[in-house]
């Protein structure tokens, strides 16, 4: 195995671990999930560019008769990238003590203010950061509102 194959293997493994954590791990951490809301997908064009670059590398590897393991690693890396960006839905998980947003756990006591913009974006002001939350369905904003009213 060459250095390139090792690096591809590491990145593929890291992306696979991230996908598993995002799908199953966050549900198990910090207690029971009380509310799950799907968010809008972002950065789709970035993934398309990434998969396009991987396709170029794959084509070059096949035409120059490169190592077969490199071909398999490039294909698996592209498939995981497609899964993460196009198949999986980003989500916001509400727990008893806080919520998961962008794979980070934020406790409720860190929230300083909450506002709703005209175009349906929930703005949560934290101590040093502002979260802009775009949900897929506007009804989910009402669910979030009722969750905060009932649980806080």
Swiss-Prot record:
Signal peptide: none annotated. One of its GO terms (cellular component) is plasma membrane. The chain crosses the membrane at residues 6-26, 45-65, 67-87. Keywords: Cell inner membrane, Cell membrane, Membrane, Transmembrane, Transmembrane helix. It comes from the Bacteria. Pfam families: DUF986. Belongs to the UPF0266 family. This is UPF0266 membrane protein Spro_2816. It comes from Serratia proteamaculans (strain 568). The lineage of its organism: Bacteria, Pseudomonadati, Pseudomonadota, Gammaproteobacteria, Enterobacterales.
């Amino acid at each position: 195995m060459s250095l390139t194959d090792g690096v591809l293997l590491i990145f593929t493994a890291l992306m696979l671990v991230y996908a598993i954590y995002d799908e199953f791990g966050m549900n198990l951490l910090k207690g029971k999930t009380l509310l799950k809301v799907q968010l809008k997908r972002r950065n789709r064009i970035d993934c398309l560019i990434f998969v396009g670059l991987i396709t170029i590398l794959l084509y070059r590897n096949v035409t120059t008769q490169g190592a077969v393991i490199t071909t398999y690693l490039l294909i698996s890396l592209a498939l995981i990238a497609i899964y993460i960006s196009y198949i999986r839905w980003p989500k916001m998980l509400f727990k008893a003590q806080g919520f998961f947003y962008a794979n980070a756990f934020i406790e409720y006591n860190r929230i300083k203010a909450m506002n709703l913009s005209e175009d349906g974006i929930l703005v949560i002001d934290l101590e040093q950061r502002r979260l802009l939350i775009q949900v897929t369905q506007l009804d989910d904003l009402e669910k979030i509102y009722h969750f905060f009213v009932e649980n806080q």
